[in-house]
Design a protein with these regions (language model features):
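Gly/Thr-rich phosphate-binding loop signature of adenosyl cofactor/nucleotide-binding cores
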Residues: 48
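C-terminal alpha-helix
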Residues: 149-160
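Hydrophobic, aromatic-rich cap/lid helix
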Residues: 63-92
Length: 162
């Protein structure tokens, strides 16, 4: 018996397989956490959102405003503890997943599009959704299209359970 009937992964991954790449990612995330503590949340968020993958987000976005209220210590701690570099890869277990999985990514986020394709191809009931003209934060950059794709997936998954 499964605890869930379906799963949606938005710009998700099953981990970094290469141990040296995991170690490098953990070190990079630790350095970024220290930078957040040094420059503060507002400066960090503004610099982070200046990246091309987030170009559609601006100060008017309520999620951006919410992020600006975070504590530097909390963001840094989360980054250190939840770094992909500290997570064991789970690619081998994906073939054992028994529920439908939607792997969703923004089309401009080439890295996570490739990961989403691999996840959807590996999970027996995997489905791929690529949101056009969108970067890494599909729910923030293209909320209507993202919600529509997720709603369709849930409806299809629910119909298959009946």
């Amino acid at each position: 018996v499964s605890l869930v009937s379906a799963a949606v992964l938005v710009s998700g991954t099953a981990g970094i397989e290469d141990s040296s790449q995991r170690e490098a990612r953990a070190a990079s995330d630790d350095a970024l956490a220290t930078r957040i503590e040094t420059i503060g949340v507002e400066a960090f968020v503004r610099k982070w959102l200046a990246q091309p993958l987030f170009r559609d987000l601006n100060d008017a976005n309520s999620q951006v405003q919410q992020r600006l209220t975070n504590l530097a210590s909390g963001l840094a701690d989360s980054l250190r503890r939840c770094s992909q570099g500290r997570q064991e890869p789970r690619w081998a277990q994906l073939a054992e997943v028994k529920v439908p999985v939607l792997a969703l990514a923004g089309a401009r986020d080439e890295k996570y599009v490739a990961i989403a394709r691999r996840i959807a191809a590996t999970v027996p009931q995997g489905t791929l959704a690529i949101i056009p003209d969108t970067g890494h934060s599909a729910p923030l950059q293209s909320p209507d299209e993202t919600a529509s794709r997720i709603a369709s997936f849930i409806a299809d998954s629910s119909a298959a359970l009946r």
